[in-house]
Design a protein with these regions (language model features):
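…primarily DNA-binding HTH/wHTH and HhH modules…
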Residues: 130-153
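Pre-recognition alpha-helix immediately N-terminal to the DNA-recognition helix
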Residues: 76-80, 107, 144
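C-terminal charged interaction modules
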Residues: 92-96, 111, 118
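Short Lys/Arg-enriched helix C-cap and helix-to-coil transition segments
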Residues: 119-126
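Basic nucleic-acid-binding alpha-helical/helix-turn surface characteristic of O6-alkylguanine DNA
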Residues: 1-102, 152-153
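Active-site and channel-lining beta-strand-loop segments
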Residues: 14, 126-128
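A short acidic, helix-capping loop that chelates divalent metal ions and anchors anionic groups
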Residues: 34, 128-131
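Regulatory, non-catalytic segments
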Residues: 103-117
């Protein structure tokens, strides 16, 4: 069974999805039919603390492998994203090297853009070598997240 809960803070609307054991998605938008569980409620509380600048990491359970777009390569990239510390960034090229795909910045960019769990899997911390780069949930949200973490871009 799938559970979902709307989250809204700082003008940002997100949907948190759980499989009853772990968060499987956080995406921008809203759903008219909420069915929260303890996992989505915990994630919502932690996201609120993050947006209020009171939390730098998340400890609710995540499940990346059940995403419809999960491939071994994407999973490797998504797991590497989890290692980027709060308040720091890496470039697409640096991330490509970190996952053993030297010269694969574009491939890594595709995997980053397919990340199913926004914010908790911090794809917003990946930037281009000479600019902010892209963001599947909109550059306005990426800028806000970088500002929350006091990252200059």
């Amino acid at each position: 069974m799938m559970y979902c809960e709307n989250f809204s803070n700082a003008g940002v609307s997100l949907v948190i999805v759980s499989n009853g054991k772990a968060v499987t998605e956080i995406f921008r938008g809203s759903t008219p039919e909420e069915l929260p569980d303890s996992i989505t409620t915990e994630a919502s509380g932690q996201l609120k603390e993050y947006f209020d600048k009171c939390r730098k990491s998340f400890d609710f359970p995540l499940e990346l492998s059940c995403s419809a777009g999960a491939t071994p390569f994407r999973l490797r990239v998504w797991e590497a994203l989890c290692g980027i510390p709060y308040g720091e960034t890496v470039t697409y090229g640096e991330l490509a090297s970190a996952v053993g795909c030297v010269g694969g910045a574009r491939a890594v960019g595709g995997a980053v853009g397919a990340n199913p769990i926004l914010i908790a899997v911090p794809c917003h911390r990946v930037v281009a070598k000479d600019n902010i780069g892209g963001f599947s949930a909109g550059l306005d949200l990426k800028r806000l997240l970088l500002e929350i973490e006091r990252i200059k871009y």
